[in-house]
From Swiss-Prot:
It comes from the Bacteria. The lineage of its organism: Bacteria, Bacillati, Cyanobacteriota, Cyanophyceae, Synechococcales. It holds the Pfam family 2OG-FeII_Oxy_3. This is PKHD-type hydroxylase NATL1_16191. Binds 1 Fe(2+) ion per subunit. It comes from Prochlorococcus marinus (strain NATL1A). Keywords: Dioxygenase, Iron, Metal-binding, Oxidoreductase, Vitamin C. NCBIfam families: PRK05467.1-3, PRK05467.1-4.
Length: 221
């Protein structure tokens, strides 16, 4: 399984978002409302109402940050970023092992992301656990860091033992649905851009960019 972690916003901006979320008193909902029938049985958290003024404001900020980041754009090839929500997990909250729905009312889920909004020392537990064939990856990032991973993976959120966990989650519908194809293109793009930075433009490099573009046309939706 290939996943990417990256700093999306700085810690100051992340703290400002958390403070806004904490100040919002009337727009929080039981997280079970947005889960499927099976997932609702194993999900406990609070989610900011997607239609609230604050949710729309913050969602636009996060989506714009993702699509304007060259590395994330190359890794995800985003056609649509959707289902973005802000969640709060208190002591005792968790989310058992589950798989994201392949198709949601808002779009197809090729990639899932979690943006950690508060510092890891602010809470105990609350790790994002992504299950692979051989092991379970436990991930708890610094404030402002994002992880993007295939929606095809089973994953869970460990129980929060102390403090509060604040994150933003969402899904990406990619122009290239297949994970292996998308990772291949990511490597090719990174290599070509590295050669461009090191050696400048050349006829040979133009052929590599041409190959990348035409492969994307063939593999894309």
């Amino acid at each position: 399984m290939e996943y990417l972690t990256h700093s999306l916003i700085d810690e100051t901006e992340a703290l400002q978002i958390v403070n806004k979320l904490k100040a919002e008193k009337s727009s929080w909902q039981d997280g079970k409302k947005t889960a499927g029938s099976h997932a609702a049985e194993i999900k406990s958290n609070f989610q900011l109402d997607k239609n609230s003024k604050l949710s729309i404001e913050l969602r636009d900020v996060i989506v714009n940050k993702i699509i304007s980041n060259p590395l994330l754009k190359s890794f995800t090839l985003p056609s649509l970023i959707h289902g973005v929500m802000f969640t709060q997990s208190l002591v005792g909250h968790s989310y058992g092992s589950h798989i994201d729905n392949p198709y949601m009312p808002s779009g197809r889920s090729d990639l899932s992301f979690t943006l950690f909004l508060n510092a890891p020392e602010d809470y105990e537990g609350g790790e994002l656990c992504i299950q692979t064939i051989n092991k379970t990856e436990k991930i708890k990032l610094s404030a402002g860091e994002i992880i993007i991973y295939p929606s095809t993976q089973l994953h869970s959120v460990a129980e929060v033992k102390d403090g509060e966990r604040h994150v933003c989650v969402g899904w990406i519908q990619s122009y290239v649905q297949n994970n292996e194809d998308r990772n291949f293109l990511f490597g090719l793009d990174a290599g070509a851009k590295g050669l461009l930075a090191k050696h400048g433009r050349s006829d040979e490099l133009d052929l590599i960019f041409q190959a990348y573009s035409n492969i994307l046309r063939r593999l894309g939706d």
